Amino acid sequence: MPRLSTELLIIGGGATGLGIAWDACLRGFKVVLIEQNDIGQGTSGRYHGLLHSGARYAVTAPSLARECAQENAILRRIASAAIEDTGGYFLATPADPLYFPDRWLKACKQASLQVEEVEVAELLRREPRLSPRISRAFRVQDASMDSFDLLHILRRAILEAGGHVLLRHRLVGFIHRGGTLVAAEIEDLMTASPLCISFELAINAGGPWAAHIANFAGVHLPLALGKGTMVAMASRPVHSVLNRCRPPSDGDIIVPVGSVSVLGTTDIPVSDPRDLQIQDHEVDALLAEAEMLLPGITHARALRAWAGIRPLLAPPVDAGARETRSLGRAHAILDHEALDGPGGIISVVGGKLTTFRLMAQECLDVVCERFGRSVQCSTSTTALEPADRRFFALPMRHRRLAHREPGNHASDLICECEFVQQGDIHRALAADPPQTLDDLRRDLRIGMGPCQAGFCAFRTADIMAPVLSQPAQELAAFLHERWKGLRPVAWGKTLQQMEFIRRLYAELLGFSQPPSGSR
């Protein structure tokens, strides 16, 4: 069996795990991170795209609100390439409690958050699609953040700092010695071959899988899982983040991300981190709540729906049974040896994507204490440099295309929706070969535009054929995965396009496995 040795083994490749690995590398630790899927395939890649100002938590969790505000400012400095400074508003509608805006505003001031009440008439001039029935409006420091971009630059920073990131490597067990974990048994999911990694300390950053990972160590981790459903609209009628000024509840936010608007979110307790099934009533509720802010949005085209799992630390008696909306979003760092568990493992649970850097800093402070090292955190002042091929915001692509030499470049365009060209794909394949079409989607946004892979998928599969073991099966899997998000919003123009794409693949291209409406 192949063997590796490291100081820190980090389990989980979401924002938390990658942030911990980055901080650890900068502090001089030898680091190996394992992730059972691709970067961005878990909770961090399944959120609504909001960089929190902290205002959402001013009433319910003031300390978390302050943390979000602090980290918001830091991330704007160190990861600006992944952030669009949209700004945001908290808005009071006729359906919201009259008492809440004043209570919320007082809490924001007590938490030292930047909040400014603005005239509704002024806001309507800026955002004319908003409901004229809004009674009060408050400007906050919200922004939108592309988590795929963020995760990729984190991974790049880890590799450049000397760390190792092993994708599609799954933990299957720990090796104990005298009550302390000393090694991990790993399976390479691409080759089905085993790997043993010895370590001095393991850090469990598995998100919704953290309890499962802890079980391998003989530790019960009381996690409550909350499923949140989101709907992406195929247009961007507003340019700022919109929040309902009311106690946190379902459907209280609209986030403009790239060329779409994301309606979010629901919060339903689940027991399995794989339970991502979207219910019709969730989609209906999100659209109905969005209508309160943007009249007519229910008649606009819904692009797709998806769900993510929030891992929340709960009191042991409540884990898995309590309504997850009422549970706190703060993070916790659990040294299991100090809690009468085995040595050699720490778990990091809870938190927000906005606070991932702070979570990593606090975790590494604990690690440094364990190792007897005195090395200060430097991530708050270290810029995360983007790889040129990674960032594909539409305005950037438009500018690049506008400055190209004259000529016929139509054949270069693979994805018309997201303006991805052949060269983009070839550069991605040369730099870091994706294993699947879905990997390339997270890299370049292939298949994420209005056609939802209808026209770009077969072109991309043709280019990737040399690196795909079974191109036809991979294309079928990619299309079916895209259609999972289309089915919950399959009405009107979306339903028409689904039928058009089905017939395109089945009748024109003669594809033996066209997407279908079956579940």
Mark where each language-model region is:
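Beta1/beta-strand and adjacent pyrophosphate-binding region of the FAD-binding site
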Residues: 2-16
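Core beta-strand elements of the Rossmann-like FAD/NAD(P) dinucleotide-binding domain
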Residues: 4-6, 191-201
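Dinucleotide-binding Rossmann-like beta1-alpha1 core, especially the glycine-rich loop
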Residues: 48-122, 126
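Flavin (FAD/FMN) cofactor-binding and adjacent substrate-gating region
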Residues: 92-161, 166-167, 173-180, 258, ...
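Flavin (primarily FAD) binding-site architecture
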Residues: 204-218
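Intrinsic disorder at enzyme termini
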Residues: 391-401, 407-410, 462-519
